[in-house]
């Protein structure tokens, strides 16, 4: 949907291999993925026994996970990359448009943009979601993770805090720097991108958030980005010293995650006949949970 420096002026291309076979492509994919995993930093920090996944909830507060995993309708509405594809924007230009739309939405919600911040970034998003009439609270509180089948013992605590922020009044203030970061989340976060893909694939669900999508984003999607091989790929794609959450979002920007999600959901709906958001979320959960394992060949 936008031009970038990685592919430069090259047109996107696809290569179809063994299109008439059913078993062989899966076998090749399995073996190729296994070989690739063996070559991706088999030694080092990520493979040490005491390594901890970065997207984990702790008692100290872990709202940075929301950057990657919260499908916020208020953020998803700010921009529709597919609708801007004909404008031939760069990723930076798309980010600027998103930032402009976000700043306008913040002003309408009564959030001040200033030189410094005094409000947590997700408290600001909670205000945006409340102001826009977002159904995110119902989706969060209706998710299986929140109601007994908890992905972690801390997830429900974070949801309760977010809901409390939605109910609070008072003034909020966000800095220009955090405004840009939040615009990047709105444009490129995988969870927000998947939510937009659901809306374009199932137009009747536009503006809604299914509870199963919340479970998908905070469950299988979060686990996927916690995988050591995924982390190695993401961390290699950004400058050294970049925090993992920021790196994951920038990777989704470079990898055109929104376009990939839109096309994949379109194909799954129309080829595999996944007829609704709940069924699609279940399918994506299985896809994100697939691992290469240790294949044996007879």
Task: Annotate each language-model stretch with its function.
Residues 1-298:
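Helicase motor interdomain insertion/brace
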């Amino acid at each position: 949907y936008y031009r970038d420096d990685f592919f430069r002026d090259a047109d996107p291309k696809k290569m179809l291999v063994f299109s008439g076979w059913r078993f062989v492509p899966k076998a090749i994919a399995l073996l190729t993925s296994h070989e690739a995993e063996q070559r991706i930093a088999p030694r080092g920090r990520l493979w040490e026994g005491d390594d901890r996944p970065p997207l984990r909830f702790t008692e100290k507060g872990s709202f940075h996970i929301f950057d990657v995993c919260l499908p916020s309708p208020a953020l998803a509405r700010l921009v529709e990359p597919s609708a801007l594809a004909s404008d031939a924007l760069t990723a930076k230009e798309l980010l600027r448009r998103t930032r402009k739309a976000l700043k306008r939405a913040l002003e309408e919600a009564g959030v001040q943009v200033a030189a410094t911040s005094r409000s947590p970034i997700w408290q600001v998003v909670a205000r945006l979601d409340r102001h826009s009439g977002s159904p995110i609270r119902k989706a969060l509180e209706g998710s299986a993770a929140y109601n007994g089948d908890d992905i972690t013992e801390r997830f429900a605590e974070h949801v309760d805090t977010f809901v409390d922020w939605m109910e609070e009044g008072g003034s909020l203030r966000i800095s220009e720097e955090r405004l840009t970061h939040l615009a990047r989340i709105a444009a490129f976060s995988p969870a927000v991108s998947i939510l937009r893909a659901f809306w374009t694939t199932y137009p009747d669900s536009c503006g809604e958030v299914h509870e199963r999508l919340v479970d998908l984003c905070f469950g299988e999607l979060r686990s996927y980005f916690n995988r050591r091989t995924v982390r190695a790929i993401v961390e290699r794609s950004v400058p050294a010293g970049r925090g993992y959450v920021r790196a994951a979002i920038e990777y989704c920007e470079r990898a055109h995650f929104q376009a990939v999600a839109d096309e994949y959901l379109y194909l799954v709906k129309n080829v595999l006949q996944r007829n609704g958001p709940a069924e699609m979320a279940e399918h994506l959960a299985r896809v994100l949970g697939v691992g290469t394992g240790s294949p044996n060949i007879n």
